Each structure stands twice: as C-alpha cells, then as structure tokens.
Amino acid sequence: MAETWGGRVLGGLTGVLVCALALLAAGCGVVTTKSDRKRAAELAEARYPGILDVLSARTLFPATSGSEVTFSVADDPDAAVLLRIDAAAGTCDRGPCDRALDEAVERGRSRAGELRRMRAAFTDCGYELVGATPALSAPWVAAAPTNATVTRVLAEIGACVRTWSPARDENGAPRRSVTVNIVAPGLARERPAGKATSPTVLRMTDPGLLGALAKRPHYSVSYTVRDGVVDPASGRAYLSFPWEDRRAFEKTVGDAVRDWLRTTRPRAGVAMVSGLWWLAPGTVDRLEGYVLFCDEAGGGARCAGDHAVALTVDPEGNPVGDFQVIRDVRDDHGRVRLPQE
C-alpha cells in the first residue's frame, strides 16, 4: 500500500513538473497565445485599419492567461507597439482594450521618436549609435579612444549626450547622471544585424545584440547632470568586463594587494576588490581603484574591510605605480566612502 501510494505521489509530482515546464511552451493545453493573438489582430484592424500588423506574441508567464502581442506600424518602420491582452477575460492591461491599444500606440510612437532623437544626436556628433538599453536610457556607440584622444572623445560624446538626454528618466525623476557605453568599432561591425523586417526600436534594443556588444571589455562613461543639463566635460569612464574577465581581473588585483600587504602588514587580510575601476585621466591603459582590507585576518572573525589600498593597474589588473593606504573608509552606518566613488 505504501509503495503504491508513494508511486502515485511520485507520478503526480512528475506530472506537475512536466506540466509546469510545458507551460513555457504550450501551457499543458491551458496557456496559449493563439486566441490572444487573434483577438489582438481583430482589435488592431478595427481601430487602426491597415496600420498595425502582428509580429509576435508571448505568454505572460507565470500568469495563467494573457499574452504580450507586438505589432509593427505601417507608417513608422522604427516603431513597435506592445499590448498585453487577455482574450478570455476580454481585457487589455486589465482594462478596456480600445483605451489600452490607443495608449500602447502612443507609447510605441513616442519611443520610436526618442530613438530617432538619440540616433540623430550621436550621428550629428560623428558617432554611430549601435544599440541602446530597452528603456533607451543608456546608448551604445562605436569609438576607439587612445591615450592621445580619450579626453577629446569623451568630451565629444558628452556633447552628443547633452543634445539628446532628457532632463528626467523613464520614471519621471530628475536625472543625476547619464551613462554611455563605448564599444570598439571592430566589435560593433560584428554585431548581429537582426531581422530587416523588425522595427528599428526592437533591433536596437534586442537582448542578443546587447549581449554581443557586452561580450568583451568595453568602456562605460558617466556624465553628470546639473540643473537638468548634461555637463559634457564631466565624463568619467570605467572599464566594464564580462563575468569571466572580471573574475580574472579581480584575482590579479587581489593577489597583488595581498602580496604587498604581507610585506607591510603581515596580519592584514583582503576583503574585496572594488566594483568600478575608472580610467586614469588622459589614459585608456591605466585604471584607478581600491581593494578593501582589515588589520587582522583569521581567528573566525569576518574581514569586512575597514580600510582600503588605492592603486593604479593596467587593463589586466597588474599594478602600475605605488600602493596607497586609506584608513577608516566606512561611515557610522557601515557604508564604504571612498574618494571618487
């Protein structure tokens, strides 16, 4: 009896697991995009005849019903319209479908206009826009700064940002800074082109494209916004790494600081390598950052890192120049406060 009951439980659990996995694809006969896609097409033709064309539909997992349907826009090849629809419930975005579609079209056209404004600003400055984050808050551009040109390049890109950047972010809050990602022109040329029939906004924000651009180390530049206006001269760049490259970089830096501490503070222990390594002014091959350490390591106590070693390294993490100790870098709340961070 127990064995039979156990077998039934195991079989039931297996069935539940299989069904849960199947929900992602076919919904075990429950979750499907077919009816939602059909209803979305009917709604679009009735409200915007000849303008909207269904491109795709995806299940709103883990929801048990409803889909997100994507449309192209006949009179705007840059625009994409995204509508959440539940045909079974007769709702869109949990409300009336006519209103939801109107709002989705307005958002889609507005987003396309924002992308065009971003692209024009960088093109006019002489820099190619090769991608953008989905919220269109951080552009990706192609450039190859050198030690001789990096100051000029960052200022020129800053001027592009000043022309493009809105004073408020996507949530309506005042911007304090704007980030631009700089990728090598060679890598930009190798990026996936995407489907030529896809709206430009989808191709430029495609996760596959952004993943390809980020697969090698690249520069991320932060520009300060003052009184709603970007300061072009405020650009500070740091090196952004793919995961494996970051691990190797942090190990090289951490090992170097650990070896140096052994010669000056034998009982000290390394806590962590700081997250951002900024380009030293006027260079692309020198990075400035910090490694946190504690005076006493071992003894079962956790090394939180109350002090820091500041140093300059090359892009592989090898130290270049002197080490500088900065003591008591944590405030009364335990937060790390370091210069330039």
Task: Label every PLM stretch briefly.
Residues 83-188:
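Long, acidic/polar, low-complexity amphipathic helices and coiled-coil-like
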Residues 78-104, 296-334:
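A short, surface-exposed beta-strand/turn
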Residues 51-85, 277-302:
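Exposed beta-strand-loop-beta-strand "reactive/processing" segments of non-cytosolic proteins
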Residues 2-29:
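Secretory targeting and sorting signals
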Residues 214-308:
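Intrinsically disordered, low-complexity segments enriched in Gly and acidic/Ser/Thr residues
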Residues 28-56, 106-122, 240-273:
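Short, non-transmembrane alpha-helical segments in secretory-pathway proteins
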Residues 159-226, 230, 237:
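Glycine-rich, aromatic-bearing surface loops/beta-hairpins
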Residues 39-44, 48, 150-173, 260, ...:
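Short, non-transmembrane amphipathic alpha-helical segments
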